[in-house]
Structures are given as structure tokens and as C-alpha cells.
């Protein structure tokens, strides 16, 4: 087999017939598969052992040679080589075709490559290939030119002959008529009879004329056709062609079918064609030029590669190895077989029949029909259904051809190469494991034993519990008690990976140290549930076991859950205590007035705990406690004379003192009620300022405290805790009157339906808000529902409002708001009508969610594909470019504060330039990491904007550099070289995709074209760079605005400042203007509200503007849903969308006009041309949608496994494309290590040299007196048992 580690590039090309024969181990001549009685393969058939190898290891077909000792011998009786049966997976055969056939991919693909090469329309090509027309393949122009005069004379003579014959025939008939008439007259016949005779004679003469005219016409047509005959002409008229061939067959040759195409290709002059096409491109216009460009691309592909155009026509076809198209026996003695065998059988049958017909010398029409059927059989084998009706099997099911085996989710690429199943894995239901540490998980004993079986067996033998592996296996299967002890030992320090599907981001797989647990469920730490998006309502998780030392090291260092506290999308902690833990900590840290023991003082926490245990102190009572090592909270006013480090009597509650025990010793004392918000600030602070080990310990302590105090708090809900406000009735009644008044105005015709709707919606929204306010006032402070919502443990006020206040307004399935509210709440219960309108929205919500999930998954897949080769390739690209970002702004209240976009725009990046204050003090150096601390310092110093490095301005050729990317949000440190930031970006954008709403937004009113697309569809529209629906125009020039309005239409006219021709933008009457009549607009200014077309932004304002536009617009959608994603992730994707340039004029560069060139290659070519003094190429930057950009990648393997597999492979094979295996996907397909992280080439050949000290320790210097001669024996000369020496352990002979 091929070793994947010995090559760095993979090329695909066109195979010629000789290549196919060279790969083959023999010709398949018969359509038989296996003998139904003996079940052995038939000789020369599709499963023949002579061709493909033996079906049993080391055994030939006839049984003469059995056993491995005959390895490599070819049996002289049956001709089968004695070898392993697995060669049947790799040995190929071939079928020698009796007539050539074309390859359907090259003839039928869009565009038809064969058609482009030969300059034929696909339908004409089809006529030739399927025997409906003849094609002229050769014309002897010289000889024809020489002989033309004599041939002209011949044809003239023949014409004369025909005319002469006609005249003689007519004359003879006329004479006969006269004789007949004379005879009739003599007989005295009536005039009627004479007229009949005359008419009959006239008819006959007309027929003679007609016949001779047809003859002359035919001669004329044949002669004209012959005079103008040239190569590649088609002739669909069989009779005309026959005559041509009969008369002038020596001057030309023509034929039908693939043979005609093959002849054309043999004599095709690529160089001359390329030159002619270049000339057409230079001088041509419009359609001709475009077609010439497309044709040149195909011609060029053959010129620049070793591919021969003849590869598109096949003389023999390969037969793939039989184990890849197996035939298996089912229970009932019937056979199930791969569809390919049926398709191959049809080809062989037709081929054999054609051979027989040719041998018999059958008439041409029969032979041609058989050839056509052979062509169709080969088409069906390669790509069934591409032309005409697909070949069907039993039950009218189309058979799966070779193309279908590659395509789609079930095809070879995605099913077997990118989605392999993994050994050493298991899955089970998860339950919560609150007793675990953050880095642990509970693994069921049986599952652990099965997973670690080989390790346990080896250890059993090492410890002499078992004699050999076989007996160790028996022990494990019988689950002896010693096995469990060994299992405990084996699993220590051996991490396992847990994965929950769907794995939407990198935190969907994490490593844990296993702890053995009883039962069959996996125990999961409650804090990692958020990362896995797991809950315990029956979710299942998979366990994988990293085997090699490297894999274990990676799992421990990179994937251990305690090292994955931060979320890669925004760099903030993901392991947040939630629900029960929050209510517990809220209960612990709240204070109660008048509580038991309030106002007392204690000498230490221990004393306060003692008082609490004795029942003399309430947990929430405000007391004074003396602390010895208190770090005071920020803003604490210290008593006079106190210095830090001394003991201090501090006013707090016992609960808060206990809460602070869970935090690191030097963390400032938290002296306040801790709800969800406060807790998130604390955890964020811990993650930013403390090492991971301490953060994990603190989180575990918070979890313990949270659960413990939640249990002791006894928080419950009864129906009596849901209190409906007493004022609700009067509030509703007052608004009912207002609503009735509006309805009355509408019925009198004073207001329109639209106005009525809007007013009613306003009235009832206000009513709902009033009821909400009354309800909140009505809740007692220590009411449990109030505490749950107030602490952020569960639910929100909107949900409480629906239970205790009123449901309010709801929407119908179209998304319009129904102007009649639901006045009841769930505590009171809904009326039938109310219930009915409420179900609308609920049902739509469920349908939406289902659709969203699939859409979001597909978006993630496209994002991963476009960005998978963005890897950090170098430390610093050395650029000084960057993006200017705002870090502080003045709010409406006049106070300067941090800008809202700091989190996603400036945080976790690298400074591009040095920042100085107004007085010239250096506040931060270029290259510094921008963290929370630095941002706060800069804002305080009065800095408003800073310039930061960005992926968009990175100068790296491949991938991007560490400095431009900045901090890795998942680790909080500068990103490492080798990090696959493209995939992390795709996951960060795709993972929250499911949360984005599907609906297009309606503000009441009827649906209309200018509804703003929002949510997921908007994100897709942006990343696919589509022109948005209801596009808003942007001004192409700077100038003055005039708004021109008529009854029906409205348009904006811009008069440019430079006096050029004015530009008109027609817009709808409904659109909202962003400019007024007479305003001055700048270039690129948006004229009406709505979404602008990114392609226009690129054309008018340039690449930097479109980058900013795309990043801002995508962020807009995510922010509106409350999802935080860092800008850098979106920038990585946008960078990939702008990677290519369309070549406008190739100059002297080695580029084709109109081709999409990679920006780096385009610049390199131009540099080369300019250095040689030539004319460089000109191009314009191209914005490609993510699907198009994925397919335009330089890696054909990656593109083929993404979409349109056959199209990509056709194109790649024709151009002889090489895949340099730089991305991740290509390497996964080939089974190589991915070039990210430690798989980067720079780490491949690392040698670790021991230091001198290490060498000295390893080889101690001996004196003679120190040598101990006791390697075998005890020095006393007494013999020792061989078992005590570790010789041949595990290989003891079993002499029983």
C-alpha cells in the first residue's frame, strides 16, 4: 500500500488507454460474477481470481497451493497468484472496448470541455457521439482544389445527361399522346374521354419533370456540399452523406460516434488553435471574445500539462477492484450486489455482442446501433442519469454509478474519508456528577473495562496475575476481582475525551480524567454543561480514548476541561455557575434586617460559624467579624491607623464571609449580594487575572457552596407564590375604554385600518407594561419567584408577567401582531379564544427551530470549508497597517466611558502603533496585547481611538500571522503558530447560528418587499455576498441631490460636482429616505434605508470599505440577538472572501484574461514581469461568496469533498491540478497529520539533544572496584529461576 507520509503533493490528471492497461492485472472478458453452485468466482469474469487475486489468504483457485510458504507463486493450473486476499481491494482489471467511447464527464459536463476544445455545440456533439450525424474528420484540400475543374465538368456533363434524358422522355410521351388522341378521334370518342387521356399524359410529364428536377437538385446539393466541405462539418442526412461518400469518398473521410471524435483529437493542433484564440481575444468583442476566452482556458489546460486530449475518448475502461463492489450472500441464499456490477455487466455484454457483430461483418446500421448502446452503457457506468433516463434496477430504483459513489453526504469523500468511525470509543447517557472536580468525569466500570481492555490485559501479565495475554483476556471477560484493581491503576492519569453531538464548536469535545462509577451512565461535571450545551433529560455522550503518548499529552495539555474555561468566540468564561448554584450563592450572600444575632461581633469566622451551628446567629444577619488577612473591597474606606495586612473588624454577614472563602486568598473581599451578573464579573476577573489552576479550584469551590446552600435554603415554589396584582382589573378596564374609542373612530371612517392597528397595538403594549409594573411592586421581596428572577437563576420578568400579570399581545403565523391582547395570565387560565390565538405563535416557534437547526448547520459547514486553510503560519508578518478602532465615547449624559464595541473590536488584539498621551507620555508600545487592564488605562488617560493589528491587513501569503491575529480567545495568550484560527472562526460564527431568529421582521402591517431580512438569512446573504432583496442604492459620485416625485414613481437624481452626466436612482414610494432634497452627498453614501449590495460597496469604495461593511453588518445581526462574537472571527472569513482578483488584461504575465487568480500569485507574476521590463497584468479585486470561494480553492481535494464533486474533479483532471496539501481537509482525506499545531512541517524533524548534565547523569563513571558482576545470579554461584529474569514474558509455551 501507498505510504501517505512519503509525498507532499497529489496530482490528478487524465488517464490514457495505456495507463489503464498498465494499472490492470488482466482483461475482464465475461459478464459472469460467481458460480451459483460452488460460490467461487468465474474465470475471466468480474470477480476472477486470476485477475484480482485469491479470495482466501495464501490459497489458489484450484487448491493446489495452500499455506503461506508458497507466497508469490503463480499456480500453473489456474493461474492465480498465491498471496493475501486483501489485494482484491487494490488490484484493477480492464475491459478492451470493441469501439471507442467518449467519457461522459467531458462531453456532458457544463461547460462541455470536448465541445469547447473542438468548437462544437453540445447538441451537435451529442448527434455525432450517439450516431445521429456524420462528422467530417479529414479533407484532402489540395487534391480537391486541383481536381475541382475536372469534377465540375463531370457534374456539368451529368446535369446535361439528366436534362437530356428528361427532354427525350417528355418528347416520347408527347408523341404517344398524339397517337392516342388520333386513335380516339378515329373511333369517334367523346370529348370527355379525350380530356381524360390528355390529363393523364400531362400528369405523367409533370412527374418526369419533377423527378428530373429532384435529381438535378440532389446533384446540386451534393456538389455544393462537396465544394465547401471542411473538417468538423456535420452531416445529419444519411442519404446525402452516402452519395457524397460514393462519389467523392477519396477526397475526405467522415464517421460517426466516438471514433469520429477520436480521429479529430488525434489530428488536433493545440498550438495553432491557442494562437488563433489569442488573436480573437485581442481583436474580438462581446460573445465571440467571451467564448474564445473560455475555449482558450481548455486549450491552455492541455498545453500546460502532460494530459493528452485523447484521454477524453476511451479505448478501454478500468474495472475497479472487486472488494470495492462486493457481492454478499444473504440468509435466503440470494445475493446482494453492488450496483456497479450490474453496470459493468451491461458494458461487457454489449461489448461482446459488438465484437461478435463485427466478426460476422454485420450491416453498418446494426453495428452502429450496438456501438451507440455500448456508449450508453459506459455513460451509465460513469455517471448514471447524466444523459437521458437513468438505468434502473429492481423496483425502478436508479443504479448508483461511479460518480454517485463519490457525491454527496453518503459518497466516498464525506462518508468514508472525512467521516471515519473511531476505534476505542463508547457512548452512554449522561447524569450529573456534582461531586466531581472540574477536570474529572465519571466513567461506568463496564465501559471503562471495555475501553481500557488491552491496557488492563498487559498490566495483568506484567503483574504476574496472568501467564499470557490469552489468559489475561479470559480474566477480563470473567471480570475477576483483581481486574478491577488493575483497572483503577491503569486509568489514573489517562485522560479520556468526551463528545456531545452536535459538536458545534471546539468545546464540544473535552478531555477529563476518568473516575470509575457504578451503573451505566457517564457522570458529567455540572459546570461544563454550558460548553457541551448538555442537559440531563436523556442526552447521550460519546467517550474516546487517546492511545499514543502524544495524543494523551495533547488531551491533557490542550483539551482538559480545566484548561478550557474561556469561550473561543469572545474570550469570556464559559464555565459559569448557573441555576441552583446561583440561587444558593444568592441566598448565601443576601442580608436580612432584624435577623437573629444582627449587630453582634465575632473574633473570627470560626466563632461566627460556631454561633450559627448553635442556632444563635442567622446566616444573613449583618454582623462584625474580625479578619486577619482581608484584602478590602474596592472603594473601601479604611479606619484611621489601619494598614493592609493587619487584622480588621469588618461589617458583613456570615454568608458573605463563607462565600469569600471560595475565592482566592488575595482576591478583594466581595461584600454584596451576588446574583448572576455579579458572579459573571467575578469569574471573568478570575479568568483574566489568575492562573488556570486557581480559577478551576475557585469554580469548584463556588459550585460546592452553591449546591450546598441551595439545598439548605429550601427554595420552593407554590401556586400561592404567584401573586396577581389587585390593580390589574382597573388597569385593564381603563385601557379597554381607550381601545373601544379607537375602534369607534375606525367604524365611523375617521381613521384607516392601518392607523387603527397601530394605535391599538400602542394602547395594549402600554397596558401590558402597566400591569407588569404593578405586578413587580406587588411581589414581596423574599418571595421565591422574585428571588429566582432577581438573582438570575432562572426565568425573566417577561415569563413571570405571563404567569402572574397578563399574556399581552401575540403574533400570528405571518409574524404580524394581532391587535387584540390576551388579558388573562396562566395563573387565572386562558379562555378558549385566547388559548386559540396563543397556539399560533407557539406552533410557529417549534417549526422555526427545526428549520433553523438545519440552516445553521449548513452555514457552519460552508464557513469551515472556506476558512479551513487559515492557519497561523508565522510569528509576525512585519506590516504596520491596521484598523483604527474606538475605545471610548461620550454618552448622552456627557460622561466619557468605554465604547460598546471595545469587547469585540479592540479587546484581545495587538497594538499596531505606540499610543502616547497629550503630553507625550508613552502609554503603550506597538505590539502590546490589548487587554481589559490596558483598555481601562487608556480610557482614563483620555485616549479615544487606537490602531490595532488585524487579520484583514495581515501581509502573510498563506494563512495569517500571530501578531495580526492577536490573543487566542480560548487561552487568553498570544495565539501560537500552527493554531487553526480559520476553523475556530467558522465555529464561533456557526455555533450561535441556531439562536438567530429565522423570521423576516414585520412591524405589524402587511408583508412587503422592503421588509428587512434579519437573523440567519441575513448572515447567509452577507457571507454569500448576494445582492440583498430590496437593495438600497449608494451614491456612485459626490454631488447634489434632487428628489423627483410623481404620482406613481419616485427617483433620486444626483448631479456630480465635476459636472459629469447626472445619475438617476429609481426608488419605491414606500422607501424611507436618508437624504433630503438639495443635500450634498459623498461618494458611497447610502440614499435610502435598507441593505446595500456589498459588490457595489467594493466597486465604489474599495476593498477596505467592503471589509468594514461586512464585519459591521454581521455583527449587527448577532448583537441584536445578544450574542457576543469577536470581530476577528468575522474578519478571518471576510479575508477569505476577498482572496482573489479577476484578471482584466493579462499583459505579459502568465495569466489568462478573465481568470480568477489568487491575490498572492497575481502579485508574484506582476513582480516577475516588471523585473523583466514587461507590461504587468491589470485586475480588479473580486468579492466571492463563501460557497464560491470554497470551490475556487487551490486544493482540488478540498473543493471536491465540499460540493459539485464531479464538476470539480472534471475540471481538476483536465487542468492536471496539483494539490500541495496545505489545508486541513486534504490531509484528513489522505489520513495524514493535519498541518496545524504540532503537525506543522517545522515540528516534523525536531531532534531533542540531551544536555551535558543529563548525559553525565545517564552514564556514571565506574571504577573497577564498583562493578557489580551480578547480571545473572547472586554472586554466590547458586542458580536462579528463569522466571525472575524478565525474559520472553508473555511468550511462555503452553505444554498442556
UniProtKB/Swiss-Prot annotation:
Zn(2+) 2 binds at residues 877, 954, 961, 964. Its cofactor is Mg(2+); Zn(2+). The RNAP catalytic core consists of 2 alpha, 1 beta, 1 beta' and 1 omega subunit. When a sigma factor is associated with the core the holoenzyme is formed, which can initiate transcription. It comes from Beutenbergia cavernae (strain ATCC BAA-8 / DSM 12333 / CCUG 43141 / JCM 11478 / NBRC 16432 / NCIMB 13614 / HKI 0122). The keyword Endoplasmic reticulum does not apply. This is DNA-directed RNA polymerase subunit beta'. Mg(2+) binds at residues 535, 537, 539. GO terms for biological process: DNA-templated transcription.
Amino acid at each position: 500500500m501507498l505510504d501517505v507520509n512519503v509525498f507532499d503533493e497529489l496530482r490528478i490528471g487524465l488517464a490514457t488507454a495505456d495507463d489503464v492497461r498498465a494499472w490492470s492485472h488482466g482483461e475482464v472478458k465475461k459478464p459472469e460474477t460467481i458460480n451459483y453452485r460452488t460460490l467461487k468466482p468465474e474465470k475471466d469474469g468480474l470477480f476472477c481470481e486470476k485477475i484480482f487475486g485469491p479470495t482466501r489468504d495464501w490459497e489458489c483457485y484450484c487448491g493446489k497451493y495452500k499455506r503461506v510458504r508458497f507466497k508469490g507463486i503463480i499456480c500453473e493450473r489456474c493461474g492465480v497468484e498465491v498471496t493475501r486476499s486483501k489485494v482484491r481491494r487494490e488490484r484493477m482489471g480492464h475491459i478492451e472496448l470493441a469501439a471507442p467511447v467518449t467519457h461522459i464527464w467531458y462531453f456532458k459536463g457544463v461547460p462541455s470541455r470536448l465541445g469547447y476544445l473542438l468548437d462544437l455545440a453540445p447538441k451537435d456533439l451529442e448527434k455525432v457521439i450517439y450516431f445521429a450525424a456524420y462528422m467530417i474528420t479529414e479533407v484532402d484540400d489540395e487534391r480537391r482544389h486541383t481536381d475541382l475543374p475536372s469534377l465540375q465538368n463531370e457534374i456539368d456533363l451529368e446535369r446535361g445527361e439528366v436534362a437530356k434524358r428528361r427532354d427525350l422522355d417528355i418528347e416520347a410521351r408527347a408523341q404517344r399522346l398524339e397517337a392516342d388522341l388520333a386513335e380516339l378521334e378515329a373511333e369517334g370518342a367523346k370529348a370527355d374521354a379525350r380530356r381524360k387521356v390528355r390529363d393523364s399524359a400531362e400528369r405523367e410529364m409533370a412527374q418526369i419533370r419533377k423527378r428530373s428536377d429532384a435529381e438535378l437538385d440532389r446533384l446540386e446539393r451534393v456538389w455544393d456540399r462537396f465544394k465547401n466541405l471542411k473538417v468538423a462539418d456535420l452531416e445529419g442526412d444519411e442519404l446525402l452523406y452516402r452519395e457524397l461518400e460514393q462519389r467523392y469518398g477519396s477526397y475526405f473521410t467522415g464517421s460517426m460516434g466516438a471514433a469520429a471524435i477520436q480521429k479529430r483529437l488525434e489530428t488536433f493542433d493545440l498550438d495553432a488553435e491557442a494562437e488563433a484564440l489569442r488573436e480573437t481575444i485581442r481583436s474580438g468583442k462581446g460573445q465571440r471574445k467571451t467564448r474564445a476566452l473560455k475555449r482558450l482556458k481548455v486549450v491552455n489546460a492541455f498545453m500546460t500539462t502532460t494530459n493528452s486530449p485523447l484521454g477524453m475518448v476511451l479505448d478501454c475502461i478500468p474495472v475497479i477492484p472487486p472488494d470495492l463492489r462486493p457481492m454478499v450472500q444473504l440468509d435466503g441464499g440470494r445475493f446482494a450486489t453492488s450496483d456497479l456490477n450490474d453496470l459493468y455487466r451491461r458494458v461487457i455484454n454489449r461489448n461482446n455482442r459488438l465484437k461478435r457483430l463485427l466478426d460476422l461483418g454485420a450491416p453498418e446500421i446494426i453495428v452502429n446501433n450496438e456501438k451507440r448502446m455500448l456508449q450508453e452503457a459506459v455513460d451509465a457506468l460513469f455517471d448514471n442519469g447524466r444523459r437521458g433516463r437513468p438505468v434502473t434496477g429492481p423496483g425502478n430504483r436508479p443504479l448508483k454509478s461511479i460518480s454517485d459513489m463519490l457525491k454527496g453526504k453518503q459518497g466516498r469523500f464525506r462518508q468514508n474519508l472525512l467521516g471515519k468511525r473511531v476505534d476505542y470509543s463508547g457512548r452512554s447517557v449522561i447524569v450529573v456528577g456534582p461531586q466531581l472536580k472540574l477536570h474529572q468525569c465519571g466513567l461506568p466500570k463496564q465501559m471503562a473495562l471495555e475501553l481500557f481492555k488491552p491496557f488492563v490485559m498487559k498490566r495483568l501479565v506484567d503483574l504476574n496475575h496472568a501467564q499470557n495475554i490469552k489468559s489475561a483476556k479470559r480474566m477480563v471477560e470473567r471480570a475477576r476481582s483483581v481486574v478491577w484493581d488493575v483497572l483503577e491503576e491503569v486509568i489514573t492519569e489517562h485522560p479520556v475525551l468526551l463528545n456531545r453531538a452536535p459538536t458545534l464548536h471546539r468545546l464540544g469535545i473535552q478531555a477529563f480524567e476518568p473516575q470509575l462509577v457504578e451503573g451505566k451512565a457517564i457522570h458529567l461535571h455540572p459546570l461544563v454543561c454550558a460548553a457541551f450545551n448538555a442537559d440531563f433529560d436523556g442526552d447521550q455522550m460519546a467517550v474516546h480514548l487517546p492511545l499514543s503518548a502524544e495524543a494523551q499529552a495533547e488531551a491533557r495539555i490542550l483539551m482538559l476541561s480545566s484548561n478550557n474555561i474561556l469561550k473561543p468566540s469572545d474570550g469570556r468564561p464559559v464555565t459559569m455557575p448557573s441555576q441552583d448554584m446561583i440561587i444558593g450563592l444568592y441566598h448565601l450572600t443576601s442580608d436580612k434586617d432584624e435577623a437573629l444575632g444582627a449587630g453582634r461581633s465575632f473574633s473570627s469566622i470560626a466563632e461566627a460559624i460556631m454561633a450559627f451551628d448553635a442556632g444563635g446567629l442567622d446566616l444573613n444577619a449583618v454582623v462584625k467579624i474580625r479578619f486577619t488577612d482581608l484584602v478590602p473591597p474596592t472603594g473601601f474606606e479604611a479606619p484611621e491607623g489601619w494598614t493592609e495586612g493587619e487584622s480588621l473588624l469588618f461589617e458583613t454577614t456570615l454568608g458573605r464571609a463563607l462565600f469569600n472563602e471560595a475565592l482566592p486568598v488575595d482576591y478583594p473581599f466581595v461584600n454584596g449580594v451576588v446574583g448572576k451578573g455579579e458572579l459573571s464579573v467575578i469569574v471573568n476577573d478570575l479568568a483574566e487575572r489568575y492562573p488556570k489552576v486557581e480559577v478551576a479550584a475557585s469554580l469548584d469551590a463556588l459550585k460546592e457552596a452553591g449546591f450546598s446552600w441551595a439545598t439548605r435554603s429550601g427554595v420552593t415554589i407554590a401556586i400561592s407564590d404567584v401573586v396577581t396584582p389587585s390593580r390589574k382589573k382597573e388597569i385593564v378596564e381603563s385601557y379597554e375604554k381607550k381601545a373601544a374609542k379607537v375602534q369607534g373612530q375606525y367604524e365611523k371612517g375617521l381613521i384607516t385600518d392601518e392607523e387603527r392597528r397601530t394605535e391599538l397595538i400602542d394602547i395594549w403594549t402600554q397596558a401590558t407594561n402597566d400591569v407588569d409594573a404593578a405586578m413587580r411592586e406587588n411581589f414581596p421581596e423574599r418571595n421565591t419567584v422574585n428571588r429566582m428572577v432577581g438573582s438570575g437563576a432562572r426565568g425573566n420578568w417577561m415569563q413571570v408577567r405571563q404567569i402572574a400579570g397578563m399574556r399581552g399581545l401575540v403574533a400570528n403565523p405571518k409574524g404580524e401582531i394581532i391587535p387584540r391582547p390576551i388579558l388573562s395570565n396562566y395563573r387565572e387560565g386562558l379562555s378558549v379564544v385566547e388559548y386559540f390565538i396563543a397556539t399560533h405563535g407557539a406552533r410557529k416557534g417549534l417549526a422555526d427551530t427545526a428549520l433553523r437547526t438545519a440552516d445553521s448547520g449548513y452555514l457552519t459547514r460552508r464557513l469551515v470549508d472556506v476558512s479551513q486553510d487559515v492557519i497561523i503560519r508565522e510569528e509576525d508578518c512585519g506590516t504596520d497597517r491596521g484598523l483604527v478602532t474606538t475605545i471610548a465615547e461620550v454618552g448622552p449624559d456627557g460622561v466619557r466611558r468605554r465604547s460598546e464595541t471595545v469587547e469585540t473590536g479592540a479587546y484581545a488584539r495587538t497594538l499596531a502603533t505606540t499610543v502616547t498621551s497629550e503630553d507625550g507620555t508613552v502609554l503603550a508600545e506597538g505590539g502590546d496585547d490589548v487587554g481589559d487592564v490596558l483598555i481601562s488605562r487608556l480610557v482614563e488617560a483620555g485616549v479615544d481611538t487606537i490602531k490595532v493589528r488585524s487579520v484583514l491587513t495581515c501581509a502573510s501569503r498563506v494563512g495569517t500571522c500571530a501578531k495580526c491575529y492577536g490573543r487566542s480567545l480560548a487561552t487568553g495568550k498570544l495565539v501560537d503558530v500552527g493554531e487553526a484560527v480559520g476553523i475556530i472562526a467558522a465555529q464561533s460564527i456557526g455555533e450561535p447560528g441556531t439562536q438567530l431568529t429565522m423570521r423576516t421582521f414585520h412591524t405589524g402591517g402587511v408583508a412587503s418587499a422592503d421588509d428587512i431580512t434579519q437573523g440567519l438569512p441575513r448572515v447567509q446573504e452577507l457571507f454569500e455576498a448576494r445582492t440583498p432583496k430590496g437593495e438600497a442604492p449608494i451614491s456612485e459620485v459626490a454631488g447634489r441631490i434632487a428628489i423627483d416625485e410623481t404620482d406613481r414613481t419616485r427617483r433620486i437624481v444626483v448631479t456630480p460636482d465635476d459636472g459629469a452626466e447626472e445619475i438617476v436612482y429609481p426608488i419605491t414610494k414606500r422607501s424611507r429616505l436618508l437624504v433630503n432634497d438639495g443635500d450634498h452627498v459623498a461618494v458611497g453614501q447610502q440614499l435610502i434605508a435598507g441593505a446595500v449590495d456589498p459588490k457595489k460597496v467594493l466597486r465604489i469604495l474599495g476593498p477596505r470599505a467592503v471589509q468594514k461593511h461586512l464585519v459591521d453588518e454581521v455583527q449587527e445581526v448577532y448583537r441584536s440577538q445578544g450574542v457576543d462574537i469577536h470581530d476577528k472571527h468575522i474578519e478571518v472569513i471576510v479575508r477569505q472572501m476577498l482572496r482573489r482578483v479577476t484578471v482584466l488584461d493579462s499583459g505579459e504575465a502568465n495569466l489568462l484574461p478573465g481568470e480568477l487568480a489568487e491575490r498572492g500569485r497575481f502579485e508574484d507574476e506582476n513582480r516577475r514581469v516588471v523585473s523583466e521590463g514587461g507590461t504587468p497584468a491589470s485586475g480588479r479585486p473580486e468579492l466571492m461568496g463563501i460557497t464560491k470561494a470554497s470551490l475556487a480553492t487551490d486544493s482540488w481535494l478540498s473543493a471536491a469533498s465540499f460540493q459539485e464533486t464531479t464538476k470539480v474533479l472534471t475540471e481538476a483532471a483536465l487542468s492536471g491540478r496539483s494539490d500541495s496539501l496545505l489545508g486541513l481537509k486534504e490531509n484528513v482525506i489522505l489520513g495524514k497529520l493535519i498541518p496545524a499545531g504540532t503537525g506543522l512541517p517545522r515540528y516534523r524533524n525536531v531532534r531533542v539533544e540531551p544536555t551535558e548534565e543529563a548525559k553525565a547523569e545517564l552514564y556514571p563513571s565506574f571504577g573497577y572496584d564498583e562493578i557489580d558482576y551480578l547480571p545473572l545470579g547472586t554472586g554466590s554461584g547458586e542458580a536462579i529461576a528463569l522466571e525472575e529474569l524478565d525474559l520472553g514474558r508473555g511468550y511462555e509455551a503452553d505444554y498442556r
